[in-house]
């Protein structure tokens, strides 16, 4: 079943009613769409073209990029591989990935494109975060944006999901049990994540009761935004970091899936602790203990590798005060 999420024109300040809708979407689902975001389809197509050339290389060549730049299959999923480009110097990060196997002209064009994309997405995250803070009222974005989110940084993953050829023959039966998880159920380790997915779709979010799954379909000219664990904790649990997954195979269609996911995070040294004004909206009960962002990221990384069929540990496991469940 498809989930109808609100769509926000992020090119202009949101009205009071739109801010209310934004707050409601973040509380109920932790997902929404944005339009007029400044990232053109032409840029997306160029990124896909360059990245496809990299993904088509032999595994031995791709592994030369190193573990910090390339995630091969069977780390997060047997069907998933990704390139990582980290800010704030997106150019240098991209260049370090492809230096090993590309010519200088291709290297510079690829790195320049990654730099442009990373900088656009960083500015977009800043704009979205200010809107989310404004949705709380009380001028929260003026009070806390610079002090709490001013040092946030971003990185993005270029994701390639591949259907195994030995599972392509039986896809016409429409059997829900025959679906393949390209990436298993998880939450994001970010403040916010922005996803640009192709027209194949496959993104699903788990309902609050933990029973159902809803499709978040691609929407023309729109990007998907979701709340991550760090913002979930910073808002004392008021905004939802939802469990979600990616499906590769569904009812009569088989193909590769391509997406760009930009993760906007606190710096590693940031102590995550909900402000009193935010806690007050939860009847004054503090739900999460304070924690250092880098400690949480290391906790997640140590608990996720190779566990394809398990929902990874989240900030709920790491920092929630036990008697507040």
Curated annotation (Swiss-Prot):
Residues 152-266 form the Fe2OG dioxygenase domain. Keywords: Dioxygenase, Iron, Metal-binding, Oxidoreductase. Disruption phenotype: Longer root hairs under Pi-deficient conditions. 2-oxoglutarate binds at residue 257. One of its GO terms (molecular function) is metal ion binding. One of its GO terms (biological process) is root hair elongation. Binds 1 Fe(2+) ion per subunit. It is an enzyme of class 1 (oxidoreductase). Gene3D superfamilies: B-lactam Antibiotic, Isopenicillin N Synthase, Chain (2.60.120.330). Its cofactor is Fe(2+). Fe cation binds at residues 186, 188, 244. Negative regulator of root hair growth. This is Gibberellin 20-oxidase-like protein.
